[in-house]
Amino acid sequence: MMDILMYLFETYIQSDVELLVDQDELSDELSRAGFHQDDIYKALNWLEKLAALQETETIPYMNNSAITSIRVYIPQEMARMDVTCRGFLTYLEQIHVLSADTREMVIDRVMELETSDFVLDDLKWIILMVLFNAPGNENAYTQMEELLYGAEDGYIH
């Protein structure tokens, strides 16, 4: 599913291609590109849920978090995101690329992925997708894009 999400992000979203593409047409194109129908459906559903996160004004689990609060990960989140991924999220919060809200959106989207081999590079792409879709995060998106395409290890020194 990550391959499809990255393909869609690079092909349609990042390249400013007209986004008024029919879902059936898009599904057919992805099938012709070699992706399996089940994975296509899951990826498109994942993107719809990402869009829904942007449309809701209040998401209950994101309310009332103080700036000084520390995120405690549940066992399922720790199983999906290793210590490197969790450390990277903390790092991005410290340099103000992610806010508590965008961090929670990222974690929500990561947990919706059906993968057993989630790695830091996958996380970086998810973060980029969330920031691109979250209004008012243009500067954070630019910083994340520089991290993704710039530094090899992803950390600014």
Swiss-Prot record:
Q: Which InterPro entries match?
A: Smg
Q: Record's Pfam families?
A: DUF494
- Annotated PANTHER family: PROTEIN SMG (PTHR38692:SF1)
Regarding protein family, the annotation reads: Belongs to the Smg family.
**UniProt-listed NCBIfam families:** PRK03430.1
Q: What is this protein called?
A: Protein Smg homolog
* Provenance organism: Photobacterium profundum (strain SS9)
